[in-house]
């Protein structure tokens, strides 16, 4: 995600339309910031899941992993889709890195269970009575 965000920011700075970089458009700057926020949310949740790896309660570990997987999946999808939009047609060509990054982020979203699977798993772990939470 970080590489795709950096590639997108660089593209916004160098691609010119009507003689000015498209990155000078405030709307595109906001989209870039939204991508950065999603990236940082994913990093934070991954760090949280890593910290919870030492938690003695297996239910709490599973909750942390599922929560991280949901956030990483959502962030990956958002960053990938936004990058493709900001790059325009070149964003999905085989010759350009952005398309490859987007495909990889899509694959990551479905590794070890989909985002939806982990959202349901998290909800079940959170709402199940304590004697059923194993």
For each feature predicted by the language model, list its residue ranges.
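Alpha-helical interface subdomain recognition
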Residues: 1-134
């Amino acid at each position: 995600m970080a590489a795709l965000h950096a590639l997108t920011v660089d593209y916004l700075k160098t691609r010119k339309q009507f003689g000015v970089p498209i990155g000078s458009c405030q709307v595109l700057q906001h989209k870039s910031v939204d991508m950065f926020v999603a990236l940082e949310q994913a990093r934070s949740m991954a760090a949280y899941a890593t910290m919870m790896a030492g938690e003695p309660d297996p239910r709490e570990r599973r909750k942390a992993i599922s929560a991280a997987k949901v956030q990483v999946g959502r962030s990956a999808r958002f960053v990938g889709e936004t990058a493709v939009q900001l790059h325009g047609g070149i964003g999905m060509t085989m010759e350009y890195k952005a398309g490859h990054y987007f495909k990889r982020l899509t694959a990551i979203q479905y590794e070890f269970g989909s985002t939806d699977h982990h959202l349901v798993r998290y909800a079940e772990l959170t709402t199940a009575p304590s004697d059923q939470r194993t």
